[in-house]
């Protein structure tokens, strides 16, 4: 469903008050990411064969399943992402030059999702055959890769009405043919290198899915030469050995997991200079990336109204009213003031800008104050905002990567964190931050930036009851030991990993919407899948306790015995009445 923007809204979106706001808009416009992902699948005879690594499932079906799952996930977390699928070496009647457009490159929508979902359902129910619906072209005369990539490039660059321009573009390239015929021809290889080079010029990147197996390993040497040789190396980054994508082959069983890992594109939260020593003019440039975002079910909706047989989107419009008369006040008559009691202070825009620029000549900046032991300055209860992942940016200050790499190694070795002061956006107030290096166990190498509170932002916690006598008792020590043993039984020391748990509220919300839109029939006689991994974990714990109670093995029986012991201690301690409040002296009643 598409909606037209009314004229008054278009004028409001394009209108700016002054040149400063216009330049500021241009400056931050590059952070408005619009991602595009194209599945580019090469048909080969082996794509239609059952793969033992997939439990006998056909490889091509696994790829289409991954496409279907990807769109279902993007609707939840990244609904503005555009997804398309192009299959080449295909003799479908609608194919152009053996390139079949299964779904066009559009923002995730109901029509494309239903197209893929219905196709998979028809194949699963044996209504159609995969070979008939997506037939392979003559294997003896396969199409070259160059025309396919040119078509994908044109698709990425083509403006689409109602959609923003794509800023992050990826090609998910699937093949199990490691020696295409065109690679043996010098002219074809040269032509393909130029096409790949052209794609990199337009910032279109590859994510390779080179499918191999033990019986037929995939030799990636030819593709590595094409994809990495054709890519360019920036002169300022000449120390990099390669600027191309990874061409490591994967097993077919890893297709879905790799699609899920690489679907999300890095979100730049801020970009600013980091002043290590302002007097010595030692400044580097950094990028901060968003680590997590909060998704709320039912929050992504639009207000529409019926205009005849067409639904149009309704937009909100703000008006300021006179407090006494209720008449609308023109925006040109409004001004910002600060009040202190009965006093009113009015500042002009220039005076406000002067106050904001008093901290630094940079609109956003980070300034190093000093270093401190990580154990002393990094506490979980001091983190008052979502942290950012910080890496060097070589564009503004040359040598930023080498400088921060050296700083990273030193801080990691000495177990230090940096205290920094600054602001991440032009209009935000300055704050205090802790910049700490990622641990050796962390897959990502870089820094985490945590915002910490000032004295005025700290609130008093409630007083705790005094249980010193209880804590020092022998019963409490035994209970602590029993609790520690129980935790070891259930392997809870690994802690909470978000990648193991979906949000059940989100999954339920979008599951209902998906079934409604795709007209999926639900068998109400079957028990509904809860879709909540936390409840599944609880059920596993219950099952383990039950098996321990029924087991004849002495070691297995220890679990239920520890639980009984823990419950007896807990019941005994909870029944103890700790009188912490002094009793009030009641007035004596007179019996008159």
Swiss-Prot record:
Residue segments, region Disordered: 1-25
Reaction catalysed by this enzyme: ATP + H2O = ADP + phosphate + H(+)
EC number: 3.6.4.12
Keywords: ATP-binding, Chromosome, DNA damage, DNA recombination, DNA repair, DNA-binding, Helicase, Hydrolase, Nucleotide-binding, Nucleus, Telomere
Source taxon at top rank: Eukaryota
Manganese found in the keyword field: no
UniProt-annotated location(s): Nucleus; Chromosome, Telomere
Enzymatic class: hydrolase
Main location: nucleus
Gene Ontology cellular-component terms listed: chromosome, telomeric region; Ku70:Ku80 complex
Binding partners and assembly: Heterodimer of Ku70 and Ku80.
Record-stated family: Belongs to the ku70 family.
UniProt-recorded name of the protein: ATP-dependent DNA helicase II subunit 1
Species this protein is from: Kluyveromyces lactis (strain ATCC 8585 / CBS 2359 / DSM 70799 / NBRC 1267 / NRRL Y-1140 / WM37) (Yeast)
């Amino acid at each position: 469903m598409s909606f037209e923007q009314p004229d008054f809204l278009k004028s409001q979106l394009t209108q700016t008050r002054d040149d400063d706001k216009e330049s500021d808009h241009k400056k931050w416009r590059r952070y408005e990411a619009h991602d595009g992902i194209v599945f580019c699948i090469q048909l080969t005879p082996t794509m239609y064969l059952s793969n033992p690594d997939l439990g006998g499932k056909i490889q091509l079906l696994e790829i289409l399943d991954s496409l279907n799952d990807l769109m279902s996930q993007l609707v939840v977390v990244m609904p503005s992402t555009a997804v398309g699928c192009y299959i080449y070496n295909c003799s479908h009647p609608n194919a152009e030059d053996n390139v079949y457009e299964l779904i066009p490159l559009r923002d995730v929508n109901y029509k494309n999702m239903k197209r893929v979902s219905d196709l998979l359902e028809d194949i699963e129910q044996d209504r159609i055959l995969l070979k008939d619906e997506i037939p392979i072209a003559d294997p003896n005369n396969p199409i070259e890769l160059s025309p396919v990539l040119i078509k994908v490039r044109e698709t990425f660059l083509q403006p689409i009405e109602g959609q923003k321009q794509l800023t992050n573009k990826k090609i998910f390239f699937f093949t199990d043919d490691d020696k295409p015929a065109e690679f043996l021809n010098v002219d074809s290889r040269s032509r393909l290198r130029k096409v790949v080079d052209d794609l990199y010029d337009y910032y279109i990147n590859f994510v390779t899915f080179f499918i191999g197996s033990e019986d037929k390993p995939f030799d990636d040497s030819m593709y590595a030469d094409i994809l990495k040789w054709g890519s360019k190396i920036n002169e300022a980054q000449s120390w990099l050995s390669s600027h191309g994508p990874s061409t490591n082959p994967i097993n077919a069983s890893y297709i879905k997991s790799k699609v899920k890992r690489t679907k999300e594109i890095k979100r730049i939260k801020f970009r600013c200079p980091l002043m290590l020593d302002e007097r010595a003019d030692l400044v580097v440039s950094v990028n901060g990336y968003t680590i997590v975002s909060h998704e709320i079910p039912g929050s992504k909706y639009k207000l529409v109204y019926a205009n005849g047989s067409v639904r149009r989107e309704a937009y909100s419009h703000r008006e300021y009213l006179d407090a006494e008369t209720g008449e609308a006040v023109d925006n040109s008559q409004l001004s910002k003031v600060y009040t202190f009691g009965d006093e009113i202070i009015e500042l002009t825009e220039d005076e406000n800008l002067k106050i904001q620029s008093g901290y630094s000549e940079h609109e956003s900046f980070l300034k190093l104050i000093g270093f401190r032991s990580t154990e002393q300055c990094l506490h979980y209860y001091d983190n008052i905002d979502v942290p950012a992942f910080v890496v060097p940016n070589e564009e503004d200050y040359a040598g930023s990567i080498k400088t921060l790499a050296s700083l990273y190694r030193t801080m990691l070795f000495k177990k230090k964190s940096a205290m920094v002061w600054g602001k991440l956006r032009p209009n935000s107030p300055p704050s205090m931050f802790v910049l700490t290096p990622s641990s050796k166990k962390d897959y990502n190498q870089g820094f985490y930036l945590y915002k910490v509170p000032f004295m005025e932002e700290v609130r008093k916690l409630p007083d705790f009851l005094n249980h010193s006598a209880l804590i020092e008792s022998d019963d409490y020590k035994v209970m602590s030991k029993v609790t520690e043993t129980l935790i070891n039984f259930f392997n809870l020391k690994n802690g909470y990993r978000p990648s193991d748990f979906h949000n059940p509220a989100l999954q339920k919300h979008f599951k209902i919407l998906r079934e409604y839109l795709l007209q999926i029939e639900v068998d109400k006689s079957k028990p509904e899948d809860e879709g909540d991994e936390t409840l599944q974990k609880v059920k596993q714990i219950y099952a383990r306790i039950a098996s321990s109670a029924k087991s004849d093995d002495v070691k297995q029986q220890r679990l239920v015995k520890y639980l009984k012991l823990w419950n007896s201690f807990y019941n005994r301690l909870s029944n103890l009445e700790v009188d912490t409040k002094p009793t009030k002296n009641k007035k004596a009643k007179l019996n008159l």
